[in-house]
Structures are given as C-alpha cells and as structure tokens.
C-alpha cells in the first residue's frame, strides 16, 4: 500500500486497560477507574430518564444538522445557530480543523505537554509541529507561543484548563493573546473542562464575533457525563463553521447522542452539583499536598489533579492499580515522576490519598 509518508513513526492511540481486565490480572474484586477524567457522579437524572424511555429508530439516519440540539445550545449561549458545529466528540473536531488548515507546507503552534491529539492530527497531515514548553508552574508560555508564529503558521492550540496540568488562563490574558495573533491564524481554545472552573468565568462565547480567527471547542463528555455518547461542539464565526462543514461527515452525531445532550444541557442544577463536588475533591488533594514538602500539586481547575511525588511514575501507577485504583502515569504525559488522577467521589479521593501517604 502507498501509505501517506506522514504516518511513518506514528502509532495509534492506546486506551487504558478495561476494569474487568485489570481485576482479572490482579485478582481484585473491585477497581475504580480514575484515569480518563470521566464524571464520577454519572449524568443527570433527566438524561437517565431519556435513556430508559427513549426509542430510537436505528434504521433511520440521525439528523445531520443536529437541529434540535443546535437550537438548544444556541439558546443556552445566546448564539446564532450558524455559529455552531457538532461533532463526534472534540476529537473529531480537532481532526476536521487539522484537515482544513494543515499540510506539509504549514506549521502549528502548541504547548507541551498538552492534549496529545493536537500533535497527533497535525503530524498525520504532515505539518511541522512547534511545541513550546510549559513554564515551571505548568502555565502556558503565551509569549513563547506568539514568538513561534510565522507566515506559515495556520493553527495555534490552547487547552484551557490544560490537560494534563490543570492550569487555567484567565480570560483577560486570553484576550490579550488574541489581540496579538495574526488575523489569518486560527486560535483553537479547547475548553473541554471549562465547566469545572471554580468560580465560573464570565460568559465569553461571543468573543468569536470580535475575534474572527477564534474557535472555542467544548464537549458533553466531561461534566455532562456523556463520554460514550460522543458529542462535542465548536463555537466560531460563521465562515469558519461553513468551511468545517465542507469536510464534516454528514451524519456524525447519533440520534441518541443528540437527545441525551439536549437533556443534559437543560439540567444546570446537576452541573452545579458536579462542580461543587469536584471543587471539594480538589481541596482534599490540596490539603494532602500541603502536608508533604516533596509533593507538588499543579493548579487544578479541571476534574483531575496532576501530582508530582518525586517517585518514578510507573511505580506510583502500579502501586495504586494493585490497590484498586486505575490512574494515568505521568510518564506518558511528559511528567516522569507524577501521576494524573481523576477527581472521584469523596471516599475515593480519601482512599487514594491514604495510599499515597503510605507510599511516601
């Protein structure tokens, strides 16, 4: 086969082991997954009711325009429907963005470490990837990113809060950054975890009307608890949306996914409960970190914490796994002595912290 040359040296995404697989390997009767930043509280009861009672005509293609969901989200953010695009998770939106803007003659700028799919998709398109190291505290080096932009740059990526560090860039700093980015360079503001930020930032979706080179990406996979439904979306100027729709598959979000997302966004009381629970979980880890001088906890603003224990990441990961908790080794994230842990229920956070104390 005459494969694209850009695929040489790349590998496919390798998901973590399933809970059942880990239990069988280690002889455990229970295991808690804290590796994929899923919502430990599940999803809204309104969503659960739809799941229990919904009848989907599986032989009929879904609404390719996601009309009802589009109206619901547009009303929620007070946007025009043409300022939205819906995709099979943010992963697909990232793929579409790289497809329309990157090729072997272009480059893209991003932080490192950050969400791995930016780099992966850029390399698939054969583009040059310019990675700007995070600052010592895990913050984006925005000045360094600006300096990396040249006439061949087509996309700049900002993950906010950043995955895997959890750092959050204030809105004023984002706007100051946007003011200095050339108007023909797209800035992707990936806000997959924005609903977890406490206190919530002011509404800023309409920034896309001021900055025509901005797209804000969000998802129903995290705080809304619909990871398996695969519904993500982008907010941008109508012309950006028009171009993306040219390459978007015609039936890319499922009928059931659209229905569940509509109910999910309606139940903001549940979202508030999730945010409060998550904030309390972060406080548990902050209190733990304060008790040990060698422990570094990166600023947590998502539904996960990145903790550097000064111990080889694989050792931490294996230790927690043997004791019933699946986490994410920092070795795969650019932090060789750290582990990323999804904020769980209070009792799970307490149990993990107790295990880490024993390890130290």
From Swiss-Prot:
EC number(s) recorded for this UniProt protein: 2.6.1.9
Reactions it catalyzes: L-histidinol phosphate + 2-oxoglutarate = 3-(imidazol-4-yl)-2-oxopropyl phosphate + L-glutamate
Xref: PANTHER family: HISTIDINOL-PHOSPHATE AMINOTRANSFERASE, HISTIDINOL-PHOSPHATE AMINOTRANSFERASE 2
TM segment ranges: none
Pfam families: Aminotran_1_2
UniProt keyword terms in alphabetical order: Amino-acid biosynthesis, Aminotransferase, Histidine biosynthesis, Pyridoxal phosphate, Transferase
Gene Ontology process terms (BP): L-histidine biosynthetic process
Family affiliation: Belongs to the class-II pyridoxal-phosphate-dependent aminotransferase family. Histidinol-phosphate aminotransferase subfamily.
Subunit structure: Homodimer.
Pathway: Amino-acid biosynthesis; L-histidine biosynthesis; L-histidine from 5-phospho-alpha-D-ribose 1-diphosphate: step 7/9
Disulfide bonds: none
Molecular-function GO terms, alphabetical: histidinol-phosphate transaminase activity; pyridoxal phosphate binding
Upper taxonomic lineage: Bacteria, Bacillati, Bacillota, Bacilli, Bacillales
UniProt enzyme class: transferase
Database matches in CDD domains: AAT_like
Cofactor(s) listed in the protein's UniProt record: pyridoxal 5'-phosphate
Coiled-coil residue spans: none
Name of protein: Histidinol-phosphate aminotransferase
The organism's place on the tree of life at top rank: Bacteria
Recorded name of the encoding gene: hisC
Modified positions (N6-(pyridoxal phosphate)lysine) in chain numbering: 222
